[in-house]
Amino acid sequence: MSSTKFLKPLCRIRAFHTSIARSFTIPFLPKIPQKPGGVSGTANDSSYMPPESRAQGSYHWIVERGLSLAVLPLIAVPLVTTGPISTFTDTFLSLVLLGHCHIGFQSCIIDYISERVYGKVHHYAMYLLSLGSFLSFVGIYKLESQEAGLIASLKSLWDNKPVEKKRQ
């Protein structure tokens, strides 16, 4: 057997494993031209430090970790209890899940649609995320105040039974 029989399939596979710069960009979004190496100025210039912000520093990290840790017991409560959970717990679970999802999608936008590369598209994505989170908050309010709540709605989907509305 010749070695060319084995090398041809490997060459085809190798093409999928190479990393090209264009494979790390979003093709339909306009990009800002970048300087070589992404460095502005000369080697002797000091780097740009963004202004300090309480919303973006360690407080942001603490809130993110707190929401992530709060999700675990709040999801376990409806699984452990057989009856309905309190309205406060249901609302708190809904809001914690909304905050957790908002921060997670915000991190994805910051990582993959960076302001340095995509410019205003980054801001549009953040505005759309904020709008979606606000509309979700309104939906949570409606679900908790006029319907049976998040957990009861999920249980009705699971059991395939209609949900009874809250009495006012």
From Swiss-Prot:
CDD domains the record matches: SQR_TypeC_CybS
Binding site for heme: C101
Residue numbers binding a ubiquinone: Y112
InterPro entries attached to this UniProt entry: CybS (IPR007992), SQR/QFR_C/D (IPR034804)
Membrane topology: Multi-pass membrane protein
GO BP term, pick one: mitochondrial electron transport, succinate to ubiquinone
Pfam families in alphabetical order: CybS
TM spans (from-to): 66-86, 93-113, 121-141
Source domain of life: Eukaryota
Gene3D superfamilies per the UniProt record, alphabetical: Fumarate reductase/succinate dehydrogenase, transmembrane subunit (1.20.1300.10)
Observed effect of gene inactivation: Does not affect SDH or TIM22 complex formation.
Transit peptide: 1-23
Subcellular location, record wording: Mitochondrion inner membrane
Intervals, Mitochondrial matrix compartment: 24-65, 114-120
Mitochondrial intermembrane topological segments: 87-92, 142-168
UniProt KW keywords: Heme, Iron, Membrane, Metal-binding, Mitochondrion, Mitochondrion inner membrane, Transit peptide, Transmembrane, Transmembrane helix
Cellular component, GO annotation: mitochondrial inner membrane; mitochondrion; respiratory chain complex II (succinate dehydrogenase)
GO function terms (MF aspect): heme binding; metal ion binding; ubiquinone binding
Family label: Belongs to the CybS family.
Alphabetized PANTHER family for the sequence: MITOCHONDRIAL INNER MEMBRANE PROTEIN SHH4-RELATED, SUCCINATE DEHYDROGENASE
Assembly behavior: Interacts with SDH3.
Function: Homolog of SDH4, but seems not to be a stoichiometric subunit of either the succinate dehydrogenase (SDH) complex or the mitochondrial inner membrane translocase TIM22 complex.
Protein name (database record): Mitochondrial inner membrane protein SHH4
Lineage start: Eukaryota, Fungi, Dikarya, Ascomycota, Saccharomycotina
Gene: SHH4
